[in-house]
């Protein structure tokens, strides 16, 4: 087939036409950031940066509906560096094409979406904070969202198909029985020559209105990166700039967040610390937990943390923020300067890949934890009338962290106590949580945040002194 197209593709007129189309397409999508300054090169730099951003994070398209709005991120993909084979990428060969990307990369490139596209509202925040695990880590990949028909709307879907599909309805029904993407459904219609009475766009938009949107993600057998979560707070701060009047509802009232459930389990220290008589090393810091598969974990699905009764656990954003803070404080290194690289991976900088084996820690993450502490302190001080609950397992970790900080007399003793507390917590939350929650005293937690902030600040001072 491709060989037959060669004469057409090599035709100069065809090539010139495609160049014009490419320019027009780039201009269309970068008009969001069109800027006129005294320097035309700077103007084009803005456009190019914006283009590069959404070619990795995706360009948000809102599909409005009578039930709720859906958001599709067109063009999303892993960044493709020609010199690094492991950064190869692919996008689906379909309309509304989306691809998979690394969590950190996609998060980095979507964190300002709300500024250019206020119509997406809370979507990005809900997606990425839901993918944060109960241990504060995140999965490796963010995948294209899928859709599934809501059970109560099945009859509405059948009626809609009766009204709009002239023939081939059974193939569409078959496609709707499982999770699907907007593009895959369009492919079913086109590849089977199914006749519909409205445009494909109208048809897809109507179908999606009867569906729930599913966040999709997966792990890679490499461990957990220390910095995957670093840009999460930026999303909230950008949202606050656009919708300051909605920040209270965002933080406290929307109980739609879940916890991603990973098949990767971080080993306790006695299983990853090695000493050969001369040198200590931290190696093979995680394992793929096959017991989870025996309990129903599905590698091909996106798995969510469940309670002991088998129900997916839902919560609000304030709990997710608290979970991040407490887990990260429990990861302070023996000098309380940085956050430990204890799960097999460093951060984005590949030159640091050897640091986890050398018990490395990250100062950048210290700054991010401190920023998150300051933000949570501000919102809790301003909106102190809310009741905050957290899973009893998380509350127990929080209590042990505070007790350790209050009673330990040395940095190493504190590190050992914090590490023991987090290992116990991970054992209790590895497969499920009880589902029982504990109310937190807001003034007490604000006081704890002050302690954490001071501890982190002291760590920065130590690092600066060490650097001098």
Regions from the language model: what does each represent?
Residues 1-468:
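Acidic, mature catalytic/reactive cores of soluble proteins
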């Amino acid at each position: 087939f491709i060989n037959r197209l060669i004469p057409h593709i090599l035709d100069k007129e065809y090539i010139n036409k495609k160049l014009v189309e490419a320019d027009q397409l780039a201009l269309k999508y970068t008009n969001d950031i069109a800027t006129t300054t005294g320097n035309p090169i700077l103007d084009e730099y803005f456009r190019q940066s914006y283009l590069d951003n959404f070619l990795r994070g995706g360009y948000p398209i809102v599909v409005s509906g009578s039930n709720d709005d859906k958001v599709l991120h067109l063009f999303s993909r892993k960044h493709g560096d020609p010199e690094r084979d492991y950064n190869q990428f692919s996008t689906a060969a379909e309309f509304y094409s989306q691809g998979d990307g690394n969590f950190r990369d996609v998060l980095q490139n979507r964190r300002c979406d709300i500024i250019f596209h206020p119509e997406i509202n809370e979507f990005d925040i809900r997606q990425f904070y839901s993918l944060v695990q109960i241990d504060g880590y995140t999965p490796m990949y963010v995948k294209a969202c899928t859709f599934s028909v809501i059970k109560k709307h099945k009859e509405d879907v059948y009626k809609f198909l009766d009204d709009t599909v002239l023939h081939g309805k059974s193939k569409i029904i078959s496609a709707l029985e499982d999770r699907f993407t907007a593009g895959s459904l369009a492919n079913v219609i086109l590849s089977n020559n199914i006749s519909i009475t409205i445009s494909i766009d109208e048809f897809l938009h109507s179908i999606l209105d009867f569906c729930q949107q599913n966040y999709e993600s997966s792990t890679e057998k490499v461990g957990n990166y220390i910095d995957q979560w670093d840009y999460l707070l930026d999303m909230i701060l950008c949202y606050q700039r656009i919708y300051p009047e909605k920040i209270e509802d965002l933080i406290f009232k929307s109980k739609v967040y879940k916890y991603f459930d990973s098949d990767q389990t971080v080993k306790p220290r006695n299983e990853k610390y090695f000493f050969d008589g001369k040198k200590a090393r931290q190696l093979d810091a995680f394992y793929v937990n096959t017991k989870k598969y025996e309990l129903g974990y599905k590698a091909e699905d996106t798995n969510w943390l469940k309670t002991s009764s088998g129900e997916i656990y839902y919560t609000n954003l304030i709990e997710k923020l608290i979970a991040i803070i407490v887990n990260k404080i429990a990861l302070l290194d023996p000098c309380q300067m940085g956050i430990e690289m204890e799960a097999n991976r460093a951060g984005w900088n590949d030159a640091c890949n050897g640091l986890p084996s050398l018990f490395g820690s990250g100062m950048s993450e210290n700054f991010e934890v401190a920023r998150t502490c300051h933000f949570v302190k501000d919102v809790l001080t301003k909106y102190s009338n809310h009741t905050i609950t957290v899973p009893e397992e998380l509350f127990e970790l929080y209590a042990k962290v505070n007790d350790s900080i209050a009673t330990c007399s040395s940095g190493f003793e504190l590190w050992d106590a914090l590490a023991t507390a987090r290992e116990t917590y991970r054992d209790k939350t590895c497969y499920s949580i009880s589902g029982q929650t504990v109310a937190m005293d807001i003034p007490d937690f604000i006081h704890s945040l002050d302690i954490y902030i001071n501890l982190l600040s002291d760590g920065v001072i130590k690092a600066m002194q060490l650097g001098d």
